[in-house]
């Protein structure tokens, strides 16, 4: 039971573009820092550039998607709003993915800033975990206690 209440920052595994199986909705932006495939990102209001999202920072949220093609600061990067990303940390299918308090990472539990960024998809037959994530950047859950 204790595990249900713990927040886990899921390390993003740097990978090649083949980790993206499908990219349904995507757009490009200018990186404000070095960004890698799988980083959860936001667009900063101060300069309009793309940065790693962070649930603890009011200037680094809300998340708008996940990096599909990364790059160094000042380069053009691809942000995926909806798609299927494989090769990530193994979690139970159906687990909701939230913006983490660790910059650019996923969390598998709410972090105080409750924005769902995706779900863990079913893996191969007869496996209890999956490394395949369905990414769908949703607006943050209102602080009034409303839920999706």
Task: Kindly give the residue locations of the regions a language model identified.
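Bacterial N-terminal signal peptides
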Residues: 1-9
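Glycine-anchored, exposed beta-strand/edge motif detector
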Residues: 11-148
């Amino acid at each position: 039971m204790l595990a249900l209440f713990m927040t886990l920052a899921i390390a993003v595994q740097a990978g090649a573009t083949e980790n993206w199986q499908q990219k349904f909705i995507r757009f490009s932006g200018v990186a404000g820092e070095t960004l890698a495939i799988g980083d959860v990102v936001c667009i900063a209001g101060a300069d309009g550039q793309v940065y790693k999202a962070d649930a603890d920072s009011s200037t680094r949220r809300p998340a708008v998607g996940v990096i599909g093609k990364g790059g160094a600061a000042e380069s053009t990067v691809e942000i995926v709003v909806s798609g299927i990303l494989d090769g990530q940390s193994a979690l139970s299918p159906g687990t909701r993915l939230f913006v983490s308090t660790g910059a650019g990472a996923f969390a598998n539990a709410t972090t105080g800033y409750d924005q769902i960024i995706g779900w863990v998809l079913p893996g191969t037959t007869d496996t209890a975990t999956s490394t395949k994530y369905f990414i769908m950047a949703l607006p943050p859950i209102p602080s009034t206690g409303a839920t999706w």
